[in-house]
Amino acid sequence: MEFIAKIFDLILLNLIFIFSCVPIITIGASTSALSYVTLKMVRGEDPYIWQNFWKSFRQNFKQGTLIWVFSILIFIFLGMDFYIINSQNTVLFAVIRILLWCVCLVALSVFLYVFPVISHFVCSTTQALKNAVFMTFGHLPYTLVMLVITGLILYLCACSVKTFALVVVISGICGFSVVAFIYSILFDRIFKKYEPKSPDNIE
């Protein structure tokens, strides 16, 4: 029964997350709230999905939105670089292309970390980004696991129309919350190393 209850919680959480992302600009705050709730679920804490989601959404709205806009600008910039570089066929540009892929992987890793960081720790936006960079490299095995999962999802989206449709359907039911829950299992292990003894510094 507990397993079934958790499945229903993840479905409910997924629907709330999708609803909260509709304005698009709110995706950052919604992602931080999603991470906040799934980490609580992993730890067996406060089970109130609706209340906890909107609590975190409100608390991290400004910070989450700022980081979300920043991340969009970063990936637009990287996309433009790829567009320019892919039109060149020299060896130099081939090397630059490889380096650019490395930058993309690092940027993606940082943004996988930063929303959970702001949802769990009280810190400035700059410090949150610094912490995300530090954790990206400081916990490389966990980072690689998250990148593989993210890469697999992106691959399925690009593989064929059928697999893309499958990803869309699953995402609409429970995909976002399930992936966030899996990531939160990893974040639980990571964050415990940085949590202060005093609860005042943790949301």
Where are the regions a protein language model picked out?
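Helix-coil boundary and N-terminal low-complexity module in membrane systems
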Residues: 1-100, 107-203
